């Protein structure tokens, strides 16, 4: 809602308003000013909750991400470990911590695994210790300005379904498993995830199904079935 006072001021001063909607569901603030704006920039014209009579205002653009996300290329090495990136953010780190660590330790007994995982600052040492004890190569962080470098190292990402993160992953052709936040307003995270799933870029797992058994089964399947993984990657 940071755009609300800016748009109110622009309306009062007679300044032209241009909106950006990165989600697949039209946000409430954008909905409020849609009638007053000149254009609304989106990643698709198939926005949920968008008035048909105002669709002429839509201008489709490529996702707005930092330049370095477009510049990164895959790092290719022989016999490299399968690298999993886990990006939780403030609303995903705890549930990801509880499930991912056990699965990675189990998978590492039969597979060469590397883990790059975001967690809360208070949990970095504990999580690092668990992976170190299991002799798993790991990078544990609470915040990283240059996320593009970490995405570049990874083979697969586990993430929520925020618009920015999914756009960054898709730009870099990284397949991802997304667990949409169930409490997101207007269910916009599920709609974001569904958009990329329809493009063939990702898999969706509902939060109620996100547990040790299902995640380990999924990752085992991906590691053993490179053809399915490569189809997602090429999309």
For every predicted segment, state its role.
Residues 73, 77-156, 190-194, 205-215:
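Donor-nucleotide binding loops and adjacent catalytic segments primarily
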């Amino acid at each position: 809602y940071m755009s609300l006072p800016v748009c109110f001021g622009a309306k009062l001063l007679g300044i032209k308003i241009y909106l950006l909607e990165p989600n697949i569901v039209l946000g409430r603030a954008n909905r409020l000013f849609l009638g007053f704006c000149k254009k609304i920039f989106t990643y698709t014209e198939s926005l949920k909750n968008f008035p048909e009579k105002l669709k002429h205002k839509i201008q489709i653009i490529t996702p707005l991400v930092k330049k370095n996300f477009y510049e990164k290329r895959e790092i290719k090495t022989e016999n490299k470990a399968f690298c999993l990136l886990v990006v939780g953010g403030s609303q995903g780190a705890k549930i990801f911590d509880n499930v991912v660590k056990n699965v990675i330790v189990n998978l590492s007994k039969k597979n060469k695994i590397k883990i790059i995982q975001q967690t809360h600052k208070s949990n970095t040492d504990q999580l690092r210790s668990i992976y170190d004890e299991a002799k798993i190569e790991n990078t544990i962080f609470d915040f990283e300005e240059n996320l593009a470098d970490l995405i570049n190292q990874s083979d697969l990402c586990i993430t929520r379904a925020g618009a920015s993160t999914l756009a960054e992953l898709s730009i870099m052709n990284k397949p991802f498993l997304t667990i949409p936040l169930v409490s997101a307003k207007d269910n916009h995270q599920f709609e974001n995830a569904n958009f990329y799933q329809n493009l063939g870029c990702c898999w969706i797992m509902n939060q109620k199904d996100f547990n040790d058994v299902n995640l380990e089964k999924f990752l085992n399947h991906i590691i053993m079935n490179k053809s399915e993984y490569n189809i997602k990657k090429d999309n």
